[in-house]
């Protein structure tokens, strides 16, 4: 989503609160909880899950392995739920022609660098760069090339924009910032 006027362009960034992340975290939690319950029921000799009789699964080696995978899955699931609740990666890109400043803000993981805030002068922006990698895992990323700073990514690598969408976004931004476009 973006808000644009004659002098200011604000692009909101979604971050980790995407439907796919919610689905993966939920599925991973349920699956790993099932693995822990099956491993525990094989250890206790009681049916904690009515789908699988505990006598059919021996604790050594199947029960131990299932418990290990279940615990590992719970850790990964809790990591996903934490990134969703902290909304890691969300923020905004603000381009202000009136003040001549570009601000890039992202939320990170809790700690000293939770707030990631970059500020540049517009006259330091050399170009808008599109990097295209075709093949099995094709990706198109939009960068802002800044003097002395290198390239700052403006789109996420997992965004999967079509060539037309990335070109249109790059053209609009380059026109707004009055800088050239480079394609790599």
From Swiss-Prot:
Asked if the Swiss-Prot or TrEMBL record annotates the protein with the keyword Protease, the reply is no
Instruction: Please identify the protein, giving its name as recorded.
Output: Photosystem I assembly protein Ycf4
Annotated GO CC locations: chloroplast thylakoid membrane; photosystem I
The free-text function statement in the UniProt record for this protein reads: Seems to be required for the assembly of the photosystem I complex.
Task: Mark the transmembrane ranges.
Answer: 19-39, 57-77
Question: Origin, by domain of life?
Answer: Eukaryota
Q: Which organism is it from?
A: Eucalyptus globulus subsp. globulus
User: So what family is this one in?
Assistant: Belongs to the Ycf4 family.
